[in-house]
Amino acid sequence: MPGSPRPAPSWVLLLRLLALLRPPGLGEACSCAPAHPQQHICHSALVIRAKISSEKVVPASADPADTEKMLRYEIKQIKMFKGFEKVKDVQYIYTPFDSSLCGVKLEANSQKQYLLTGQVLSDGKVFIHLCNYIEPWEDLSLVQRESLNHHYHLNCGCQITTCYTVPCTISAPNECLWTDWLLERKLYGYQAQHYVCMKHVDGTCSWYRGHLPLRKEFVDIVQP
C-alpha cells in the first residue's frame, strides 16, 4: 500500500532489543549471562570457523531516519559445524557498531582464525554480538576443537549450571555443575576447556574428558 511504513529488518529489531535489555545504571556496559562453551554451541543457530577479510560500517536499515550503524565483516568460511539447514556458505556477518550494544571487534586482514557462533535472522543475515561464544581458534583446546564436531551437539539435552558459592548441588539427574568460577575465579578455566557434559543411556549427565571421568576436585565441590 503506497505510503505505508516499511517493516524494520530483523537485525534492526534485534538491535532495539539489545538496547532494551541493557541493564540500567551500567551506562555503556555490555552485560552477558555466563554460559559454558557447550551451552553456546547448543543455543546458537550457526557455528563456523572463519577468517576476517575486511570490515565496513553500514546502515542498520534503509530508513534515512535510522541512525543506528552496523559493522559488516566479510569473512572466509573455513568450516561450518552447525547451521547447514539455514545457510550454506557465509560471506558476511553483522554486529552492532556500538560496543554498548555488545558489538564485536574482530581483526580483519590478518591470518587469525576465529570460532564464531551467532544467529541467522529471518532475512538470512548472520548476526553476532559479545554474548555469543567468539574465540580465536588458536585459543581453543584440543578437546574443544574435537567437541565441535560431535560431543557438544549430541549432548544438548544436558543442563549446565554455573556454581558461584558452596555448597553447589545438582537439582536434576541430567545436570552438570560448572565450577570454573569457584576454583579459578574465571569462567573459561580448565573445566570449560577440557570437559564435556555428556548424557548416559539412563538419561543422567556427567562431565567427561574423552573417556576419562571428572577430576576429583570438581566432584568435591558439591559437598557442604
Swiss-Prot record:
Binding site for Zn(2+): 30
Covalent S-S links between cysteines: 30-102, 32-131, 42-156, 158-205, 163-168, 176-197
Biological process according to GO: negative regulation of membrane protein ectodomain proteolysis; Notch signaling pathway; response to cytokine; response to hormone
Domain of life: Eukaryota
Boundaries of every NTR domain copy: 30-156
Annotated site residue numbers, Involved in metalloproteinase-binding: 69
Tissue note: Abundant in heart and present at low levels in many other tissues.
A single Gene Ontology CC term: extracellular space
Subcellular location, record wording: Secreted
Signal peptide positions (record): 1-29
Region spans: Involved in metalloproteinase-binding: 30-33, 99-100
Pfam families named among the record's database cross-references: TIMP
Gene3D superfamilies, sorted: 2.40.50.120, Tissue inhibitor of metalloproteinase-1. Chain B, domain 1 (3.90.370.10)
Cited InterPro entries: Netrin_domain, TIMP, TIMP-like_OB-fold, TIMP_C, TIMP_CS
Keywords on record: Disulfide bond, Metal-binding, Metalloenzyme inhibitor, Metalloprotease inhibitor, Protease inhibitor, Secreted, Signal, Zinc
Function: Complexes with metalloproteinases (such as collagenases) and irreversibly inactivates them by binding to their catalytic zinc cofactor. Known to act on MMP-1, MMP-2, MMP-3, MMP-7 and MMP-9.
Protein name according to UniProt: Metalloproteinase inhibitor 4
Upper taxonomic lineage: Eukaryota, Metazoa, Chordata, Craniata, Vertebrata
Gene behind this protein: TIMP4
